[in-house]
Amino acid sequence: MKFSPLVDELIQSLKCLPGVGPKSAQRMAFQLLERDRKAGSKLADSLGKAMSEVGHCQSCRTFTEETYCPICVSTKRGHSSVICVVETPADVLAIEAGGHFSGRYFVLLGHLSPLDGVGPDELGLALLETHLASGEVTELILATNPTVEGDATAHYIADMAKNHELAVSRIAHGVPVGGELEYVDSTTLALSFNGRLPI
């Protein structure tokens, strides 16, 4: 059976979301059309508004509706000498939820991936270089993901930071709290053994 062009367009549009295939997109579309048109209209309004009004902070590149995000304009954190480099705005939220970091961020919006056409320019590294050259930064914490691309990105930024007098560190990787060793992959176990701490 073929759907109407508008229904088909809605299904195709929903498939752009991560983890949403044809069947899931169809279920979502039918749920909104059959049972919750009010929520569907609210979703459309919110999505349209976010797409037109949400941009990137001109200092750290995270999501914001303003020129600068709340952290960068904060009197307590906006002038911190410590910058934590992350791959995505979601990483900022994860670190903020922990409440253990009180510095600034720099969001790469990805990682180095030459095969996908993602190089230093796409990651905004010229802006990061400007921050480092200002002399206001004393420490750079690299919190990229523990993947091949994340490691390559961290090494690239660490090399870039060598031109400046500042401490550069990488967040630790290892066994998660509450995790059982038998379920931890060998690479993570190796990192845990190599990065062990005295007690």
UniProtKB/Swiss-Prot annotation:
Domain Toprim: 81-176
PROSITE patterns, alphabetized: TOPRIM (PS50880)
InterPro entries xref list: DNA_Rcmb_RecR, Rcmb_RecR, Rcmb_RecR_Znf, TOPRIM_dom, TOPRIM_RecR
SMART domains: TOPRIM
GO MF terms held by the record: DNA binding; zinc ion binding
One Pfam match: Toprim_4
Positions annotated as zinc finger (C4-type): 57-72
Cross-referenced SUPFAM superfamilies: Recombination protein RecR (SSF111304)
CDD domains: TOPRIM_recR
Record key words, sorted: DNA damage, DNA recombination, DNA repair, Metal-binding, Zinc, Zinc-finger
A biological process term (GO) from this entry: DNA repair
Entry-linked Gene3D superfamilies: 3.40.1360.10, 6.10.250.240, RecR Domain 1 (1.10.8.420)
Family indicated by similarity: Belongs to the RecR family.
Function: May play a role in DNA repair. It seems to be involved in an RecBC-independent recombinational process of DNA repair. It may act with RecF and RecO.
Protein name listed in UniProt: Recombination protein RecR
Taxonomic source organism: Shewanella piezotolerans (strain WP3 / JCM 13877)
Gene name for this UniProt entry: recR
